[in-house]
Amino acid sequence: MIPALPRWRWALYLLPALLGVLPTLLSPGHIVGDGVDAYGTGWFFWWIKTCVTQFGDPSWTPLFFAPDGKNIFADTGNNFVDAVFSIPFQVLFGQSWSGPFTFFLLLGNTWSFERLAAELWSDVRDVIVATAAWMVNPYVVFELTAGRPTQAVMWWFPLAVLMLHRICRGDRTVRTAAALGAATALTAWTYWFAGYFLAFLLIPLGAWWSRPGERLGALRSITIGALVCFVLVAPMAVGMAIAWKHGLVPGVNGGGPEAANVDADLHGVWLMETRGAPLLIQPAWLVAALTGAVVGKREGRVWFGIALVLTAIGLGARLGGGRIMNPVWSVVGDLPFLARLWFPYRITMVVMLPWTMLAVLAWQRFGRRTFVAGLFLALSLTGEAFSGTFPFNHKDAACPPLVLNAAKEPGMFLVLPGGIQSDVLLWQTQFQRPMFAGMGESAPAFWPSGYANRRHNSWIKALQESSASPNRPHVAPTGDKSALTQLGIRWVLLRRDLIIGIWRNERSRGGKDVLKGRDAKAIAQLNVLLGEPAAADQRLILWDVLGKYTDPAFPVTGEKLATPPLDEEDRPGFERGMIRMHRMPE
């Protein structure tokens, strides 16, 4: 019987959610999260709203890698469930939609998990403590602060576990079986690999929960659920199989993690835990889980065993920098598209379920004392705050007026230096002009063939080298700058602030003096190639290849060109936390 839950529990749930998004709510125009994935998320959410409201095709966009465009379906599998749910928030709150939507996301996570917890435990205190812990578990907090709400949406998978539990306890109705399939399919539609992660969790749970003598009946219901799931994911699966057959799927039809600019040593659980944000080994959670495994008797041992198996999958296909094959992957590695799982640490999303169960078992052993539960939650949030993940990082998504003014006239943008994923993706949601490169330009696996060829154009190479390596000798481009207009490029935008990131390694070796003069050299070389700039502020310089545009609001002056931006990078808060914990170099 599901226990009656007091209404005051929502105050306990809502408080950490509100604390997490409060800095974003107090910063109009900001999005939750920071870093490269946050930029892409902000763009995708805007794109889905645009497609829904204007009846466009979300599977392809002409705004990146113009004129080729970008095949979004082949690159992402159209994981847009969370983006669709964000549309009302974008309409209601405009550029400040992200904070309210993230609050809603956390409430959805809480509601679905509480349904499961209320079925597994009869004591109201267990349900409330487990749900409060789930709200702030390190995986969800880290994914949100890094700008990945898609991976933090866990609305459906607790419901799938709930339906499986009911089936294994004797509920053989078609409705429950269909609900199991639908919840699993929705998990996959939200983030495709989460469908695999959930299946890896459901298999041992089904074997454990099903009663001897009733397993055949449970298997029949589970089979019905699997069929429902297959029907619901079939549109994507068939489309992706066709794209795979035609060699259109990056990472499956060629190009591994390195081709996607992913360090092979940083995408599995172990090195994520030791070099990135601590998730499973965050001290409060690790102590609670290990305690639960010891004092929880058989139940604790089973939950801990399930967590270990799932974590073994999350180590990735190869260990030790690629030298050792993970034996677990000899079992799961041949599943369709799993070769594209460049971030297997994300299986932590389902490992957090047994981790939460173990924490509750430990709490029960301590007599369900309120002080112990409060201490655990406080230490969990303190650990996340120390690592720089809580409250959630946030980023100003506003497009600079200099760019908005230029974009009132037609033309493609070439952003320099190239090969860097930056917040210009967020700006594009407002200036809405095509770009020469765009999302994925730092990852060769995602380049259209036409873009890969155009990068070798002598003018493109000259502009890139002038902005990124002004101290090195360059080969002069052939012909005049009309070669750029033939590519469709009108606007060349120099991000002076991004140049600092390119020179970070040399700065760390030789100090700030090594940067002296480089900014001026880059501008001088670009002026030789493009002529005088059309507009400038301290961090941006804009050239009009056609030579027809000037912006009186941002006049080009010698003082502006001679004053470089502050030579400090705007690094995400969680990266600063990793530096503080000596997990990431400065």
What are these regions (language model features)?
Residues 143-151, 255-260, 309-354, 451-458:
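Membrane-helix boundary/interfacial segments in multi-pass membrane proteins
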Residues 1-6, 118-120, 165-178, 207-221, ...:
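Membrane-interface junctions at the ends of membrane-embedded or membrane-associated helices
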Residues 9-17, 182-183, 215-238, 256, ...:
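Hydrophobic alpha-helical membrane-interfacial segments at the cytosolic entry of transmembrane helices
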Residues 379-586:
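Extracytoplasmic
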Residues 16-109, 132, 137-142, 148-154, ...:
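Membrane-interface coil-to-helix junctions
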Residues 35-51, 226-294, 333-336, 340, ...:
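Periplasmic/ER-lumenal interhelical loops and adjacent helix-loop junctions
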Residues 13-19, 101-120, 125-210, 225-229, ...:
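Membrane-embedded helix bundles of polyisoprenyl
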Residues 2-3, 207, 211, 228-231, ...:
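Hydrophobic, aromatic-rich transmembrane alpha-helices
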